[in-house]
Amino acid sequence: SAPVFADLDGDGDFDLLVGNHEGSIDYWENKGNSEIADFVYNPTQFIGVAGGRNSVPAVLDLNGDGRNDLLTGNLIGQLRKFVRIEQGNGFYFRLERRKYLNLDIGIGSVPKITDLNNDQQPDLIIGSDSGNIISFQPDPEKPGILSWKPSLEYFKQLNLPIGGNPEFVDLDTDGDLDLIVGSEEGTLY
C-alpha cells in the first residue's frame, strides 16, 4: 500500500489516497474537518483510474487550473498523469499521459512532491526499487502549465537500498528537509 494525504475535494482538509498492488487507487474522502478526520470510502472519482501494478499516487496541480491532479508511479518504472475533470457536483480523473516525462526509472517508480530548495516551487522526486532517486524542478522557461526539467545536483552521490521509497521531513527542526528512505527489507535510512 502507498498512502498519501491531500485535499482532493477542495474543502480544506486532507483526504486519503492509497495506491495498491493491483494498480488501482482507493479514495477515502474526509467528511470531518482538519482537526477531526472522518474518512469515508468513495470509489466514484477513481473508477477507471489505473496507475499500473504497484500504484503509488502523488497529488499536485499539474495544469495550472487550481485543482489537484494525480501522478502515479508503477511497477514498470513509469509515471502516469491524470487530470482532474469537474462534472456536476463532483469530479473524476482522466488519463492524459501514459508515460509522463517519457520516464523509465527502472522497476518501481515512487513519485513524491516537495520543495527541496525552499524556492516555494514544487519539486518532483522519484525513487525506485533499484535504489535510484532522480529529481525534477519546475522549468521557469515554460510558464503556465507545470513543466519539469531534470535537477541533477540532488541525490547523485547517494547509494540507496533496493526498494528506495523517499520521504522528506524536517526531522531536526533546522528549517530544511531531511531525507528518509524506506527499503524493501523494511529498514529506514
Residue ranges: model-predicted function:
Residues 23-24, 77-78, 131-132, 186-187:
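Loop/turn residues immediately N-terminal
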Residues 1-8, 54-62, 109-116, 164-171:
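Beta-propeller blade termini
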